[in-house]
Swiss-Prot record:
It comes from the Bacteria. It is a single-pass membrane protein. This is Putative sensory transducer protein YvaQ. The chain crosses the membrane at residues 186-206. Residues 74-110, 536-566 form a coiled coil. Residues 1-31 form the signal peptide. It is found in: Cell membrane. GO terms for biological process: chemotaxis; signal transduction. It comes from Bacillus subtilis (strain 168). The gene is yvaQ.
Amino acid sequence: MRLTISRKFSLVFLTLILINLLVGGIGVLNMQHIIQKTDEINTKWIDGIKGITSINYVTEHLSSKEKDFLIYTDKSKMDTLDQEMNQIMEDINQKLDNYEKTISTDKEQKLFEQLQTKVNTYMDIHAQIIESGRTNDMDKARGLLVQTEASFEDMKKTITQLVDLNQEGSNTAVKETKAVYHKGLIYTALLVAASILISIFIWLYITRNIVKPIIRMKESANHIAEGDLSNDMEALNSKDELGDLNEALQKMVGNLRDIVGYSKDISSRVLSSSQVLATATNETRSGSKHITETMNEMAEGSEQQAQDAVTIAESMNEFTESIDKAYNHGITISDTSQNVLELAVSGNENMATSLQQMKTIHHIVEEAVHKVRSLEQHSQDINKLVQVINGIAEQTNLLSLNAAIEAARAGESGKGFAVVAEEVRKLADGVSDSVQDITRIVNGTQQEIHTVITYLESSFTEVEKGTENLTDTGQAMQHIKQSVTHVADSIKEVTDGLKQLTNQSITINQSIENIASVSEESAAGIEETFSITEQSAHSMDQVLLNAEELEQLANELNEKMGQFTI
């Protein structure tokens, strides 16, 4: 297959486009992976921490309600508390169901099953506490409360393990997100470096296979324009338009050598004939003896000269057509070079925009990591507050038990334990305040989560913009632009030289036509002189004038041919 210049440039830019598409595709895949990991953090690990923490809080609330249930003796109040505790148990079951949907590992599933078993055990003890409270069996109730405390502590251990597991998963997802980003950055840098190397290779290839041959042909054309035909053109082993142009120039030089050499020979012969004609004319004046022989020689010379002029004119027409063809090829190459230059400029602008957008993405991902770390600190604050609530709950438990025991022993006089009851209410208030603190911290955590989502959505938008712009060339386009500009200038010089050579060939054609015309006139004069012998004196004068004119034209032709060096 013939690999023309246009096909070469098409392959070059197709290669660059494929590299840019590869860079953009890797960038999009990496950003999709980052978005997936972010969704995993938000929808799985963070929701898991929130869900399991809320189970811990609701269970503590249920334990507090149990103690309140044993303190009161009013049936309506006990019914109200029982109804509230049933609602809390339904809430616990609902939260367990919701958390189960976020489980993704066997270890987490195993811990969840253990938690479910412990919750069921706690619920069974709870039912017995309610039954003992309604029957006013305080000894049994106290024993059951001790069991619930142990069961609750056991549940807390499992809950803590689940929280740690979710926190570990969140940290792992963050590390994987950063690894994906750094990996994508390395791949992008490698592909950009590869693009630069390929562009440099293309630039060297164009310089060697296109620019240098054009410079050599330009130098040869300059020699031809100066009339130097002695140098042989170096053969170009290329099957594209440059090869065709080089071959046409080689043929042109060969044809010019033949034409110039033949023209020099013809001009010398014409000059010699004109001198002979002048001598013959002078001799004819002194005697008519040699008129017939001289006229025959001149007639033969004029006929030969006319035939030679026709041959030269045909050769010059072929030479002019070859020059026109080479000139048209030069214009086509010049237009192609201009298109390549425009594409190189556009590629430089797009690559600069793409690099700026990748820097913006790097900044946004760093902000997202900081926000996730802040969320981790808030989770630790929640655990501290939960410990405070546990301490208050334990004190409340002891005071409520003491109040219940004393009231049972004192009977009617148990009303004097109002002080203990007041202390219980104060501790209950402390529990309420701690719960409010937990709520506020959880709300702050949710706000941080929304902030993380906003930053990551912003990074995704920037990646999309970067992908749209990463479809063209890299930084090495500037070198290609300079090379193509140099190629275009060189081609223009070649086409200008070809145009000048065309004008010179037209001038030579006109001179040859003048020679043919003079030859025909000379032949007509000779025939007229030969046929009209009685007017020989007058005819010889006319022939002498024609001979002088022919000699002048021959001298002019010799001067023209003298400009060429064979």
